[in-house]
């Protein structure tokens, strides 16, 4: 059965789900939700995602929202199909879950307002909060130090294999690397830069970038 993904293919959170599907060889159909027109706030979409965000999915009777929960569900449901994204042991899965939580609570929590201020506000003609950006850059620098230390002794965030721990970071990292002037925060860190170069060369990621037509 083809999974329906409601969202905008260029948006970070839907990309997290789509990348999981591409790694797991899961068939999907993207139902475009135009964020610029605030279609995510309309009653029809609120039935799928009551907080007015994207993505949301429909898979037969199953309806889910929240990208990390969706990715974890499908990585578990199709554990033996495509790339193993969960970790091979109970302890390994706990470490993967830990870094998915780190991505949400520390990485994305800083990266999102950074990107909103340096990318999206200027595009919409709104002023960038320069003071906030400088404050966030200091916070982000400290967050990335933790990643640099982790990746000094591990090929990937979850250990020796590519998992959801790495996948969850990729949409946000793309904005930092490709659409802001902040890429130096990554390229100046040897281990973090090596990690990004490796994971962004994966076929599933390249396919997603083609679908998004960057």
Swiss-Prot record:
Its EC number is 2.5.1.18. Transmembrane segments: none annotated. May be involved in the conjugation of reduced glutathione to a wide number of exogenous and endogenous hydrophobic electrophiles and have a detoxification role against certain herbicides. GO terms for molecular function: glutathione transferase activity. One of its GO terms (cellular component) is cytoplasm. Pfam families: GST_C (PF00043), GST_N (PF02798). It is an enzyme of class 2 (transferase). This is Glutathione S-transferase F11. Residues 89-214 form the GST C-terminal domain. The lineage of its organism: Eukaryota, Viridiplantae, Streptophyta, Embryophyta, Tracheophyta. Its main location: cytoplasm. SUPFAM superfamilies: GST C-terminal domain-like, Thioredoxin-like. Residues 2-82 form the GST N-terminal domain. One of its GO terms (biological process) is toxin catabolic process. PANTHER family: GLUTATHIONE S-TRANSFERASE F11 (PTHR43900:SF64), GLUTATHIONE S-TRANSFERASE RHO (PTHR43900). Keywords: Cytoplasm, Detoxification, Transferase. Glutathione binds at residues 11-12, 40-41, 53-54, 66-67.
């Amino acid at each position: 059965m083809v999974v329906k993904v409601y969202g905008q293919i260029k948006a970070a959170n839907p990309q997290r789900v789509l990348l999981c599907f591409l790694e797991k060889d899961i068939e999907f159909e993207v139902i475009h939700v135009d964020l610029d027109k605030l279609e995510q706030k309309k009653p029809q979409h609120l039935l799928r995602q009551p907080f007015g965000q994207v993505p949301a999915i429909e898979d037969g009777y199953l309806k889910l929202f929240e990208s990390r929960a969706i990715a974890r569900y499908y990585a578990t449901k199709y554990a033996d199909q495509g790339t193993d994204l969960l970790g091979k042991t109970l302890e390994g899965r706990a470490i993967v879950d830990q870094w998915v939580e780190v991505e949400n609570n520390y990485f994305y929590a800083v990266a999102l307002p950074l990107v909103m201020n340096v990318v999206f506000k200027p595009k919409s003609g709104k002023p960038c909060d320069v003071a906030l950006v400088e404050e966030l850059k200091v916070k982000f620098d400290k967050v990335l130090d933790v990643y640099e230390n982790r990746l000094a002794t591990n090929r990937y965030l979850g250990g020796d294999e590519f998992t959801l721990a790495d996948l969850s970071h990729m949409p946000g990292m793309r904005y930092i690397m490709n659409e802001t002037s902040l890429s130096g925060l990554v390229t100046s860190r040897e281990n973090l830069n090596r990690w990004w170069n490796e994971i962004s060369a994966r076929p599933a990621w390249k396919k997603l970038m083609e679908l998004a037509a960057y």
